[in-house]
């Protein structure tokens, strides 16, 4: 009998505790709906992620954009070369039409330009003009030895020579900026300098 009573008491106690637990849990489950529930974006499933990735990859492969992605480098080079070759005649036509319209003057100096240069040379204080060997090498009349440096010219391959060349270039740059012809018309001065070097 005693054992029977003990189990009965235990079951009664267990029932009471479970009922109390159920009453305690019920108010927690009956909370009002969360006001921020709709602010969270729906999560992507793994399947959707894989589909999106594959779609992006396929579209990248099939769609060749303006930057020519997805094409081999040699093919891109060939296409660019073809476009350049097609553009050259168009640029020549543009140059001819601009010269005909009078927007760009021809490279030959006109009579007015020759007269202005002659007058400037008469007014200058220089009495005798001597062409140097360096000028001849620029014009192409003097023989040029490729790979041979002048003895007094600084060598760009070592640090001291590179520094000296940088100083010379900065000095020459300032002289060009202070030049009156460059200040009046910089593009004509650049054209003339390029013409002298060819």
UniProtKB/Swiss-Prot annotation:
Region (Disordered): 28-49, 137-163
UniProt keywords, alphabetically: Nucleus, Ribosome biogenesis, rRNA processing
Source organism, top-level taxon: Eukaryota
Main location group: nucleus
Compartments reported by the entry: Nucleus, Nucleolus
Keyword rRNA processing: yes
InterPro entries: Slx9-like
GO biological process: maturation of SSU-rRNA from tricistronic rRNA transcript (SSU-rRNA, 5.8S rRNA, LSU-rRNA)
GO CC annotation terms, alphabetical: 90S preribosome; nucleolus; preribosome, small subunit precursor
Similarity remark: Belongs to the SLX9 family.
Function: Involved in ribosome biogenesis. Required for normal pre-rRNA processing in internal transcribed spacer 1 (ITS1). May be involved in the movements of the replication forks.
The protein's assembly and partners: Interacts with the 35S, 23S and 20S pre-rRNAs and with the U3 snoRNA.
Protein name: Ribosome biogenesis protein SLX9
Organism: Kluyveromyces lactis (strain ATCC 8585 / CBS 2359 / DSM 70799 / NBRC 1267 / NRRL Y-1140 / WM37)
Gene coding for it: SLX9
